[in-house]
Amino acid sequence: MATPAVMYLRRAFPEAEIAMISRRSTAGVWDGHPGIDRLIVGDDRTAARELREVVRSHRFEAAVLFPNSFRSAWFMWRCGIPRRFGYARGARSWLLTDIVVYRPQEWQTPTPQPVSKKSLRESKSLPREQPRHMVEYYLELASYVARQLGSDIAPPVVTRESALPPLVLPVQSQALEVVEKLITEEGVTSIPLIAIHPGAAYGNAKRWPLDRLAVAADRLADELGAAIVVTAGPSEAELCAELVRMLRARVLNWGPRLNIPQLVALLSRSTLFIGNDSGVTHLAAAVGCPTIAVFGPMDWNVTCPWSANAVVVRRSPPCAPCFLRECPLNHECMTAVTPDDVIAAARTLLSRQQGERNERA
């Protein structure tokens, strides 16, 4: 969701060298990205000193901290970068040279306080406008950076309804070749593909029950004459296997075998994606794949997929959003979502997309 901000900084400072420091687990998103000149990878705590030396060797003049963590600000301070831009969060202001004030009422839906029924009602009844999206959050920081460093290039106009400016995530040709080869080997080159990612690294509270996912996927596969491709993170192979055992349709269990560029290539090739509130869902939205995202405990206003081809399916009990990794109650925010809800959303989305194609033709 930071890619529009990075692309804006690229336009604002066309002659600058822009480097991205990324965790190894997400580095594939930035490999070859047009908004940056260099990718620096490192997230192992034992290698912090070596990573600092690499960063110092480039003599960067400014650092833009998209993460809100204290650790990221501490790291940039230790690297000795003269200008350090970021939001004033997590008691880290003293580590930054240039601060953007964080206003919670703009960036989050009121969180219920489960102290008593009264406190819950009060927290939900506060008059509030719809919170702004994380794409805007990152762009506001980037705009401040541009102004402070002397650029007169205006930031892009944000239109939430049309998801503009768009996310930027190129499909790598080499990764697409790998995926096309796998599809050919599976004998499904001529039929639609429904990509499904059942996991969510944040915690079980964000996972839609597998039995419901299987029912929705099977029915949609029948309607579309499609094969189902199941993907997973490195620690979710068993989750994939469990889902595959429930499916009746033609299924390709690719589990965690794809790296991020290959996963992006698969999503660009898919007719439909169904997933939870996860990073993979944002990848699907970024490449324009019709995306169904089942949301539960997190703030759908702020982190929903940024795409006109994405639909959030949710049921919001009074306790949502709670931001918990494990539900201490009955997981109503996810169990209340039915296969029919997801199927109806997918039908509407695909029908709308077909109508748009017909208009262009």
Roles of regions detected by a PLM:
Residues 1-361:
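Catalytic machinery of carbohydrate-active enzymes
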